[in-house]
């Protein structure tokens, strides 16, 4: 009888560490809801003690998610565990994930402790976490380089203390599949109480073997896989969940295991994470890359036309990838747009129909016909920009040419006031940014600028993703228009609104603290 493999997603914790700018609470919630629809069993959504922002994100997601178990990370430190429990207590069901380094290198160089000290710290921390929940995971950080005798000892000890899931991370992506599978086999054969816990694996991709290591671990007896959407993560990233999930589905007969994932949601979730995290998906990325189901060789094309199974081991439809269609124009009504979104798998709560339809009409007037990829791009932008705006781009005008300094005049709505400025720059985009900076008077530094095309032909959309630094923090902005300069301007305005909201939160916290002091 096939056994279930639990899917543990850590996109919002481990995956976020790879981003140039942190996600805001609303963006994290959108990803969490998508993961819930996809059917992940556990989602690790943050490290609450690390910052007030992470605490707020974990708490917000814990309130909203009903069909997946929400998890938060904590070091083997009392405060970490208590803060994690406080953030999670609003959830219907939650897990606390405590971790501690177990390799000689980490214990001696980083922790400056002995292995016996580490054993005691793990025991006390697991027991403390069990005060709050009966679902506690313990991770042996750098397990891949931990002597097997020590690993067996601390795993047995952790289970005795109350850990219900034992996670074996290949923290630096060092092991090979044969070696990693052997570690799991050793634990199953040598730890007497191993049957009282689920063995989990968390593989990094430094040598490009994270998915292979995870699959080999499952063949050896592991029953939980940890990873991220699109393989996001520090350095070379984590185990790519869409890859490992589809490997289990396609090779289910050989592996003898299954997952509870809704495979039809894989592509859409991957696209959402890519857009919100400003991390483009390589064209040749397995499962979700734009070339994953394309065939250019004449021999391959002939085979696919005769029988798709000749060169396709899975179908695009199996991951929710629909054929691109051309069916909407400026004459299409709101109901038609809503119907098309439903056909693509979107639910009402995934987007705001009013703002989406307004953006659709503007685009349809420019392009004439709107494709599915256009509509999805607009939906993603609306998801990211649906929070109240303080700054709004009213209009702009540019003058540029060869051997001429670019000049831009920009009008911004700032609250209820219309402000305008002009500036020169090294090209039209830089000139627009200089003018916007003069209006807002924010000390903004452009860290990253990326331009990508959405669609085909002369009316393709230009998507601009930027990262700016302001007041010591980084913020992400996104713009989408047929005009690249306008798209660039809207990306900057989007980032500025993120800055403004952050500053408002800071001022409100200061006001509350001041009132508290006065009351005392």
Swiss-Prot record:
<keyword id="KW-0464">Manganese</keyword>
<dbReference type="InterPro" id="IPR002034">
    <property type="entry name" value="AIPM/Hcit_synth_CS"/>
</dbReference>
<dbReference type="GO" id="GO:0003852">
    <property type="term" value="F:2-isopropylmalate synthase activity"/>
</dbReference>
<protein>
    <recommendedName>
        <fullName>2-isopropylmalate synthase</fullName>
        <ecNumber>2.3.3.13</ecNumber>
    </recommendedName>
</protein>
<feature type="region of interest" description="Regulatory domain">
    <location>
        <begin position="392"/>
        <end position="520"/>
    </location>
</feature>
<dbReference type="Pfam" id="PF08502">
    <property type="entry name" value="LeuA_dimer"/>
</dbReference>
<dbReference type="GO" id="GO:0003985">
    <property type="term" value="F:acetyl-CoA C-acetyltransferase activity"/>
</dbReference>
<dbReference type="InterPro" id="IPR050073">
    <property type="entry name" value="2-IPM_HCS-like"/>
</dbReference>
<dbReference type="InterPro" id="IPR013709">
    <property type="entry name" value="2-isopropylmalate_synth_dimer"/>
</dbReference>
<comment type="pathway">
    <text>Amino-acid biosynthesis; L-leucine biosynthesis; L-leucine from 3-methyl-2-oxobutanoate: step 1/4.</text>
</comment>
<keyword id="KW-0432">Leucine biosynthesis</keyword>
<comment type="subunit">
    <text>Homodimer.</text>
</comment>
<dbReference type="InterPro" id="IPR036230">
    <property type="entry name" value="LeuA_allosteric_dom_sf"/>
</dbReference>
<keyword id="KW-0963">Cytoplasm</keyword>
<feature type="binding site">
    <location>
        <position position="14"/>
    </location>
    <ligand>
        <name>Mn(2+)</name>
    </ligand>
</feature>
<keyword id="KW-0479">Metal-binding</keyword>
<dbReference type="GO" id="GO:0030145">
    <property type="term" value="F:manganese ion binding"/>
</dbReference>
<dbReference type="InterPro" id="IPR005671">
    <property type="entry name" value="LeuA_bact_synth"/>
</dbReference>
<keyword id="KW-0100">Branched-chain amino acid biosynthesis</keyword>
<comment type="function">
    <text>Catalyzes the condensation of the acetyl group of acetyl-CoA with 3-methyl-2-oxobutanoate (2-ketoisovalerate) to form 3-carboxy-3-hydroxy-4-methylpentanoate (2-isopropylmalate).</text>
</comment>
<dbReference type="InterPro" id="IPR013785">
    <property type="entry name" value="Aldolase_TIM"/>
</dbReference>
<dbReference type="InterPro" id="IPR000891">
    <property type="entry name" value="PYR_CT"/>
</dbReference>
<feature type="binding site">
    <location>
        <position position="202"/>
    </location>
    <ligand>
        <name>Mn(2+)</name>
    </ligand>
</feature>
<feature type="binding site">
    <location>
        <position position="204"/>
    </location>
    <ligand>
        <name>Mn(2+)</name>
    </ligand>
</feature>
<dbReference type="GO" id="GO:0009098">
    <property type="term" value="P:L-leucine biosynthetic process"/>
</dbReference>
<keyword id="KW-0808">Transferase</keyword>
<dbReference type="InterPro" id="IPR054691">
    <property type="entry name" value="LeuA/HCS_post-cat"/>
</dbReference>
<keyword id="KW-0028">Amino-acid biosynthesis</keyword>
<comment type="similarity">
    <text>Belongs to the alpha-IPM synthase/homocitrate synthase family. LeuA type 1 subfamily.</text>
</comment>
<dbReference type="GO" id="GO:0005829">
    <property type="term" value="C:cytosol"/>
</dbReference>
<feature type="domain" description="Pyruvate carboxyltransferase">
    <location>
        <begin position="5"/>
        <end position="267"/>
    </location>
</feature>
<dbReference type="Pfam" id="PF00682">
    <property type="entry name" value="HMGL-like"/>
</dbReference>
<dbReference type="Pfam" id="PF22617">
    <property type="entry name" value="HCS_D2"/>
</dbReference>
<feature type="binding site">
    <location>
        <position position="238"/>
    </location>
    <ligand>
        <name>Mn(2+)</name>
    </ligand>
</feature>
